[in-house]
Amino acid sequence: GIQNGQKCIMMNPRRTAGVAYAEKNGGLWLDIDLGTDLLVVNAIARIIVENGWQDAEWIKNWVNNKWGSSSGFGQGTRNTPWQWRTTWGKFQTKGFDDWKKWLLSQDEFKPENAAKVAGIDIKKIQTAAEWMAKPVKGKRPKTSIMIEKGFYWSNNTGNTQAISALAIAVGAGGRPGQVVGRAGGHQRGGQRGGKYPRNKSPMKVPGRRRRALDTDTWTMSGHTRMAHVIGTTWIQSMCGSQQLAERFEQLTVANPHQIRSYDKQDIIDTLKKRADSGGMVVINQDIYLVDPIGNRYADIIFPAATWGEETFMRANGERRLRVYNKFYDAPGEAKPDWWIIAELAKRMGFDGFDWKNSNDVAEESARFSRGSRKDFNMIKVAAKREGKTLHQKLGEFGTNGIQGPVFMKEDGTLEGTKRLHDTTRKLWEDGPKGGNVYNKKLTHFNSQTGRCNIQKSPWSLFSDYWNWMKPKGNELWCTSGRTNERWQSGFDDRRRPYIVQRWPDNYVEIHPDDAKERGIENGDMLMVYSDRVPSLKETILGIEGSDYSFAGQMKAGN
């Protein structure tokens, strides 16, 4: 690790605790301005290829040419983001050499130009490139890359394409000490149901393509008749805005059809009239009565149980499967989500929802996990052989759990998967045995050929938004993040007395020079606001290629 001489490069607009620790141990801080990640990443890549430091052997064996990246798509409409982003001319390349040619042709990726826009010392870009790829005594360094939300949520497609290409250039991917991935540890693990039919989506884009339904835009356009909101504040989250709150107000509270009776049939008739009149009916399912989605706009409240109040499985970002056991009864009428959904489904006339407990749900979902990155079906197979439930068997792995996909060896023991896309992994030569299922992603990448797609990452797709958003006049960049002191929105923490006593409010960190200029001192109460907040109106149709660009939306009055 870092304390044993590992070189660490941190790219972050702020000197966080992690940055300070890395610097203390000889690391490098790329102190970029917000949103300029793509420029700096591609500038690093440019230095690497200009000097011939790329991992040529890895690239030769594991990178697609154009035929490889196009294969498997057939001749139909490119109607999913994966398809059209892979084969779109702005992104697709003919292979590494074509990507290199494109990279070197972009003036904005010259180190001096990228450094100027990003507000960073050009020497840091040069050092980063050397650390990541320059051979020492004829031996290439092993480089791994880790990203998180600030990186891929700010310029999602562009930043992801750029960092993927850089990873390919340095040979990071699928080998011990040479991997690339995100750092998130979200507790997830649900099995997906049927996909939304994208060809039915109203979100039309140029050509014959359609985007997945954007529920914010659909609601803003007044088309949402019923919203079943589960576990999200919605109006305050992501693209939430006062504009969205006003629309909720219009469609619910301001609609003339309001419940004024305790009679069940009268309530049903009233809500149907509201929906038929162009209004919206809202169901809110959450562990708290959230303001305003729950206590102001919801017509029906489903109080939900949370972790500790029901036994269930989870899988985190590294596919680590674990059981979280119940240790406390849920308050009042609160029920686990699976129970609420099952009762709704049965009342709607659907079969197959007769679960007795959360283990029943887990066992039914096990077979649908086969071949996935969290495949846990063989845990269930082992459990049934031993006369146990799936939860009981998984519980034997304790706090550490087991990483999916999970396989059963010939002696009946279970084996997890340390890393996906492991190009060094040796599988059974004669194929999977018993109920085991092999997935291409175990030893290859998720393309038709099993190789990586190296893509372009044009700055022009983001630069119009960035140039509009960057501070003007006396404005400052403002970032929001997650701190352990007051986690996220305070959804849970603000209800904990010992947290609130120590941190009664969220805090703002500001550079001393900026604070002095504005007369701000430690302990002051501040209001952080912006006079310039872009928000999409009711547009769901795109005709020209530029219609969904930021500049195109602004020109159209959105």
Model-derived segments and spans:
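Conserved short loop/turn motifs at secondary-structure junctions
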Residues: 114-120, 147-154, 186, 232-235
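Alpha-helix capping and helix-loop boundary segments enriched in small/acidic/polar residues
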Residues: 29-36, 86-90, 98-102, 153-157, ...
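Long, well-ordered, tryptophan-enriched scaffold segments
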Residues: 2-5, 16-139
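Intrinsically disordered or highly flexible coil/loop and linker segments, enriched in small
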Residues: 7, 14, 50-57, 68-72, ...
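Acidic/polar loop patches that form or flank catalytic/metal-binding clefts of enzymes
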Residues: 54-58, 124-126, 142-145, 172-182, ...
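A cross-kingdom feature strongest in bacterial/archaeal respiratory oxidoreductases
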Residues: 1-22, 33, 206-333, 369-558
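A glycine-rich, hydrophobic/aromatic-adjacent loop/helix-cap motif
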Residues: 130-223, 311, 431-432
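Generic, well-ordered alpha-helical scaffold segments in large soluble proteins
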Residues: 1-4, 43, 47, 102, ...
